[in-house]
């Protein structure tokens, strides 16, 4: 009988901390549904106390996820734990994940607490979390730089208080695999079967996956990871790499296995990339575009003669279908519906109808509509806030010797408003003109153009990060078009709509508190 290592996915919480990876509630719901389809044991849906948006997303995910455990992060503070408990209340299976720093440097300079005070706080946090849920996880932040004697002391104390999972994070990605393995082995010998040991490894030295795997070999039975290795700084351990390493190297891992349906790995990777706008590098293990590509003639010849000559796993094992059907303008609604289900989306009939209309419009302009085109069509709609402003027309004059100018028409409250303006470049002219029409000034922090597919008729996705109020966080806007300028204008208008939606949500939250 297989010994299961639980997969704890934190794409929606830690993964979202990747620069530019911010997601709205509907996007998070789509990813959560796909993670459940993938077979993830625990979905860390967010940090409930962080913002009204995080709280709302966790609550809505808790309402739709049925099989996976839904988890919220919480500092070892009563207000955080209360928010987490309330956010995950609707979940069929729920967990609160509370944490406090345990390294000398963190306790002294960040917490400004003595070790015995930290233990007391941790125990009280676990006890309070138990009043909301049965399943409580406790993390020793910066465990990689903590003293072993203190780690054992605080871990045994929180287990006594009711923690069922103990997470050992390598918060700054400092440990080497043999060090991580030795630490987990010693802790496992101390804890034995009183709690599950989990690891959460960061990739600052490129060792997150190796550290996670060595931990599993030494007693860890939960691994915290993200799709495509997303995460702040250099990212987190990549789920797909951990799972496929365990699956592929049975000579090392023996009866150890996961509950992951590996055929959903590639669809999940593509969905996350489409929603976040962050593509895995081409040579990324397992899910990169070159992972199953063989350019060398010798390699190609070998693979054609026998697949296992140069491939240790099959593309089909991760759900990469090299013979996937490509849709076009003659494709019907039934084929389109089947395709979006295969791509991991869960849409209502009304949403399918709207998506099909956009697909037909795109198919009239493109000979072939790829899977990535369809992903972008749908995720672009999911990413969109309610359309207070809507782009209707765009005309640009980008002559080589003159000053770039743009004429923009925007619809607001049923009326069309047109204005024209100049800028330091075409994009600047478009954005300044939109600012003048709406009366809201934005500051562009980031601008990305993503070629969704290949060829002259490739679909372009533009992602912008804009600050409209220095006292509020930047907002993300997405735009999609064969014309990059139109996609840019749509993205900027989308960011403005997101800003308005965020203001309305904050206002509603304040009204509820009053």
Swiss-Prot record:
Catalytic activity: 3-methyl-2-oxobutanoate + acetyl-CoA + H2O = (2S)-2-isopropylmalate + CoA + H(+)
CDD domains attached to this UniProt entry: DRE_TIM_IPMS (cd07940)
EC number per UniProt: 2.3.3.13
One MF annotation (Gene Ontology) recorded for this entry: acetyl-CoA C-acetyltransferase activity
Keyword Metal-binding assigned: yes
Function: Catalyzes the condensation of the acetyl group of acetyl-CoA with 3-methyl-2-oxobutanoate (2-ketoisovalerate) to form 3-carboxy-3-hydroxy-4-methylpentanoate (2-isopropylmalate).
Family note: Belongs to the alpha-IPM synthase/homocitrate synthase family. LeuA type 1 subfamily.
Protein name: 2-isopropylmalate synthase
The organism of origin for this protein: Nitratiruptor sp. (strain SB155-2)
